[in-house]
Amino acid sequence: MTDDQKRELGKQAYAKAMKYELDYGCCPQCVLATVQETVGIVDDQTVKASHGLSGGGGLVGEGVCGALSGGLLALSAKYGRDRNNLDKGRYMNNFKKAKELTERFRAEFGGVTCRELQQQFTGRTFDMWNAAEYKAFDGARGNKCAHATGTVTQWVVEML
């Protein structure tokens, strides 16, 4: 696939992932489902397993943004170490790809944790386990989380 074809596929993936996030939520699943449908390297079990990573992990905000987590999982689906190769080295190429994605994400969005992005996107953080706070977050963020989800998906598709 040429670089131009990858960029075009990335743009399509951006739009699909953004729509999924706006329609369904759960940013890591939206990234992975779109990567699965676009380039086919992610299986259903990985999409399912990513569910708990949303909202920085368990909706607590302290961990890595779910969209970034989904992107890292997608890269690892292609470049990561298989179970039967645990004793075969560190697979540094995967770490390099993951580092590249993480650094690009931080530069674009001003942080990597869900809370950092909440602060960047809305000027404050929220308790997503409090119904009123979650509703306030959902309104305040607009399409910014969906944009982050689409952006990560686009980058990952272009990196694969």
Where are these regions (language model features)?
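Contiguous, well-ordered alpha-helical segments that form the cores/surfaces of helical PPI scaffolds
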Residues: 29-34, 51-55, 69-76
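Short cysteine clusters
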Residues: 27, 65, 114
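Polybasic, low-complexity association/targeting segments
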Residues: 1-23
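Amphipathic alpha-helical interface segments
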Residues: 33-37, 72-75, 88-160
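Long, hydrophobic N-terminal alpha-helical segment
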Residues: 19-23, 30-41
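A short glycine/serine-rich beta->alpha loop
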Residues: 15-22, 54-63, 136-141
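Acidic-glycine-rich active-site phosphate/pyrophosphate-binding loop
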Residues: 2-7, 35-52, 124-129
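Helix-adjacent hinge/juxtasegments
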Residues: 57-96
